[in-house]
A protein has these predicted regions:
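DUTPase catalytic domain/fold
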Residues: 1-163
Length: 163
């Protein structure tokens, strides 16, 4: 079952929201806080003993709050600090307007018990690039109820990130 955005707001699962218009019947819109350029290669293994996340360089919005991004991939950080209840998981989908401009947002599953100001991958496929404004709505986060409440919540490296 999908949980409406207004229910998440009432339950305090979204701690910081820019505007009530972010509430959707099937979730909540997440907005753009930061954009980072990847500056080197990361490393992924089986048990995370060799894991190294790519370094990044934060890109700055211009004086009018705009940022032109060329074709390529970027890391983005959201404005909203989100908490996933133990009886839910969440999935992120790009806003349709973002797709229609030739860009996409990718993320992993948001596990029960996760909380933080999450990051995602922004892929700009449009050869002409895209212009994003600070606080642009870029992703819809859809919460689904689990069949049973998780016995233990997410306890990984990214819990509490970007406070």
């Amino acid at each position: 079952m999908i949980v409406p955005g207004s229910k998440l707001w009432q339950d305090g699962q979204i701690a910081e929201t820019v505007n009530i218009s972010q509430m959707q019947p099937a979730g909540i819109d997440l907005t753009l806080k930061e954009v980072h350029e990847l500056s080197d290669a990361g490393e992924i293994d089986f048990d995370n003993s060799k894991r190294r996340i790519s370094d990044t360089k934060k890109l700055e919005f211009d004086a009018t709050g705009k940022l032109h991004l060329s074709h390529g991939c970027y890391k983005i950080v959201y404005n909203e600090y989100v908490g996933i209840p133990l009886d839910c998981a969440a999935f992120g989908y790009p806003r349709s307007s973002l797709l229609r401009c030739g860009a996409d947002v990718r993320c992993a599953v948001w596990d029960p018990g996760y909380h933080g100001r999450s990051e995602s991958l922004l892929l700009v496929h449009n050869p002409k690039g895209i212009v994003l404004h600070k606080n642009a709505k870029v992703m819809q986060l859809v919460f689904v109820r689990l069949e049973a409440k998780a016995e233990k919540g997410y306890d990984g490296k990214y819990k509490g990130e970007n406070k």
